[in-house]
Amino acid sequence: MGNILRKGQQIYLAGDMKKQMLLNKDGTPKRKVGRPGRKRIDSEAKSRRTAQNRAAQRAFRDRKEAKMKSLQERVELLEQKDAQNKTTTDFLLCSLKSLLSEITKYRAKNSDDERILAFLDDLQEQQKRENEKGTSTAVSKAAKELPSPNSDENMTVNTSIEVQPHTQENEKVMWNIGSWNAPSLTNSWDSPPGNRTGAVTIGDESINGSEMPDFSLDLVSNDRQTGLEALDYDIHNYFPQHSERLTAEKIDTSACQCEIDQKYLPYETEDDTLFPSVLPLAVGSQCNNICNRKCIGTKPCSNKEIKCDLITSHLLNQKSLASVLPVAASHTKTIRTQSEAIEHISSAISNGKASCYHILEEISSLPKYSSLDIDDLCSELIIKAKCTDDCKIVVKARDLQSALVRQLL
């Protein structure tokens, strides 16, 4: 085998054996391992890495599926909004056309009316073409072509949407309505009936919207009155296409006075209390009543929700006032003046006896008010009212107080 040379802990084999062996501390050679620099494969670590890779892939697929689901929901929401916008646009177009047709009954048709009608026709034609193209179906088709979570990641998706080029026709349809100014309308009440047509002044006939005259509507007469008080005369229409005579007469309100009989006025019940004992009938600092500018109550308004059976029965259940209001007491006193009614209501509030029926009894006894006034009061209150869990209509005390001041007192 050749000579053996010992040098430290190493043994060098001479001759044919040129192998190197390491010895332990006790002189025994160490166990031979594989190639130097390589580690033994750990099957447990390999299985752990495989499980981690599978978990990462599964999480990626879940995130991708959630993203696709959210995109589909957004597409559906946009489609619903688009359909709602189209419905609203159609309704506004029809309303505008009907409004123009009504206006032409009272004045002559001018070039601006024809221009608006032409614009509406073009807009309807454009919407019809868009509906035929089916833009909504194109969006849904693009959503269907999106890859599923189990499909190939390298697959390309065509999500392009066709866009119409900007042409002169589109520019005509997108004509700005805000830049158009209607002709000037001026009311001349002092002119004779034969000269009433002179109140409408037609502006320039130019089609350019920027050169149109400004729109001004002046409905103030010479005596500075507005509303129905200034319409105490006949209005005649002298247009040749409408030869019928239109007459506006003053309404006689004497027949509607005191329509609520005293026998239907109520007695006070504990459950029908509409006002708390300290609720005023006028808004704190803005005590500016029509009734002699007199404040009713001393403490500020309350936000307490008060049940109002009158609105529940009269408006929602479609019951008449005679059936809603119970029979009044025999000692009910008829009040003739508004100041007396205010004094009675003030005393009732100060004594803590104010109720819904008590207020109606005081108000309906006045010749100035009728069931129509009570309907107006209910119509204003129902805007700010809300329904409770027990199907009762409640109104805040502050809203009720301001409604009484505006509508009745």
Swiss-Prot record:
Motif placement: Bipartite nuclear localization signal:
17-24, 47-54
Give every bZIP domain span: 43-106
User: Region c-CRD: start and end of each range?
Assistant: 356-387
Q: Could you tell me which residues belong to the region Disordered?
A: 26-64, 127-156
**Basic motif: annotated span:** 46-69
The alphabetized list of GO BP terms reads: cellular response to stress; positive regulation of transcription by RNA polymerase II; response to cadmium ion
Q: List the disulfide bonds.
A: none
On whether Transcription regulation is a keyword of this UniProt record, the answer is yes
| One cellular component (GO) term of this entry | cytoplasm
Q: Look up the domain of life of the source.
A: Eukaryota
Q: What happens upon changing C356A?
A: Only partially accumulates in the nucleus in response to cadmium. Does not accumulate in the nucleus
Tell me what induces its expression: CAD1/YAP2 expression is at least partially regulated at the level of mRNA stability. Two small upstream open reading frames (uORF) in its mRNA cause increased RNA decay. The translation initiation factor eIF2 counteracts this effect by causing reinitiation at the functional initiation site, thus suppressing RNA decay.
Localization, per the record, is: Cytoplasm; Nucleus
Q: What UniProt keywords are attached to this protein's entry? A: Activator, Cadmium resistance, Cytoplasm, Disulfide bond, DNA-binding, Nucleus, Transcription, Transcription regulation
The UniProt entry, under SMART domains, shows: BRLZ
UniProt-annotated stretches for the region Leucine-zipper: 71-99
UniProt GO MF annotations: DNA-binding transcription activator activity, RNA polymerase II-specific; transcription cis-regulatory region binding
Record PTM text: Depending on the oxidative stress inducing agent, CAD1/YAP2 can undergo two distinct conformational changes, both through oxidation of cysteine residues, and both masking the nuclear export signal, thus abolishing nuclear export by CRM1/exportin 1. Peroxide stress induces the formation of possible intramolecular disulfide bonds as well as intermolcular disulfide within a homodimer. Cadmium may bind directly to specific cysteine residues (Cys-391 and either Cys-356 or Cys-387) in the c-CRD.
Q: Where does this chain carry the motif Nuclear export signal?
A: 372-379
Q: What is known of its domains?
A: Contains a C-terminal cysteine rich domain (c-CRD), but lacks the N-terminal CRD (n-CRD) found in its paralog YAP1. It probably also contains embedded in the c-CRD a nuclear export signal, with which the nuclear export protein CRM1/exportin 1 may interact in the absence of inter- or intramolecular disulfide bonds (or otherwise oxidized/modified cysteines) within the c-CRD.
Function of the molecule: Transcription activator involved in oxidative stress response and cadmium resistance. Regulates the transcription of genes overrepresented for the function of stabilizing proteins including the inducible Hsp90-family protein HSP82. Preferentially binds to promoters with the core binding site 5'-TTA[CG]TAA-3'. Activity of the transcription factor is controlled through oxidation of specific cysteine residues resulting in the alteration of its subcellular location. Activation by alkyl hydroperoxides or cadmium induces nuclear accumulation and as a result CAD1/YAP2 transcriptional activity.
The record makes one more remark, namely:
One of 8 closely related fungi-specific YAP proteins (YAP1 to YAP8), which all seem to be transcription activators of the environmental stress response and metabolism control pathways and to have similar but not identical DNA binding specificities.
Name the family the entry cites.
Answer: Belongs to the bZIP family. YAP subfamily.
**Quaternary form?**
Homodimer; disulfide-linked, upon oxidation. Interacts in the nucleus with the nuclear export protein CRM1. Interacts with RCK1.
Q: What is this protein called?
A: AP-1-like transcription factor YAP2
